Curated annotation (Swiss-Prot):
GO biological process, alphabetically ordered: DNA-templated transcription initiation
Statement: the UniProt record of this protein carries the keyword Manganese: no
Superkingdom field: Eukaryota
Compartments, as annotated in UniProt: Nucleus
Gene this protein is translated from: TAF10
Naturally occurring in which organism (per UniProt): Arabidopsis thaliana
Protein name (Swiss-Prot/TrEMBL): Transcription initiation factor TFIID subunit 10
InterPro entries the record matches: TAF10 (IPR003923)
Length: 134
């Protein structure tokens, strides 16, 4: 019986923490604007007049984007650096995030990205638009 009281108290504390967190979202301005989140939620068929829920989705989205960017950076750092012969270029150690790095990071989250065909790789490049078979 004591176990039931403890779990009830823990549930009450969780509910109170959730209520407090949702209330704090009213004073928070997320990185991703409310209008943008509302647009994509509506596009997916979700309508909600509660700003707190929209901001909760914005915070979750922001965290997802930050996690993917961090993972992509780790993939970028793990990639072998190209051999540079010029001493000036050796001092410049900027990392270049590639689509391959981003694809690997997204794949860890179950998102498969197809690389778009480059315009220059298209068989119809340089052809008259009227004669293209695309």
């Amino acid at each position: 019986m004591n176990h039931g009281q403890q779990s009830g108290e823990a549930k009450h504390e969780d509910d109170a923490a959730l209520t407090e967190f949702l209330a704090s979202l009213m004073d928070y301005t997320p990185t991703i604007p409310d209008d943008l989140v509302e647009h994509y939620l509506a596009k997916s068929g979700f309508q909600c007049p509660d700003v707190r829920l929209i901001r909760l989705v914005a915070v979750a989205t922001q965290k997802f984007v930050a996690d993917v960017a961090s993972d992509a950076l780790q993939h970028c750092k793990a990639r072998p650096a190209p051999v540079v012969k010029d001493k000036k270029q050796q001092k410049d150690k900027r990392l270049v995030l590639t689509m391959e790095d981003l694809s690997k990071a997204l794949r860890e989250y179950g998102v498969n990205v197809k690389h778009p065909e480059y315009f220059a790789d298209s068989p119809s490049t340089g052809m008259d638009p009227a004669t293209r078979d695309e």
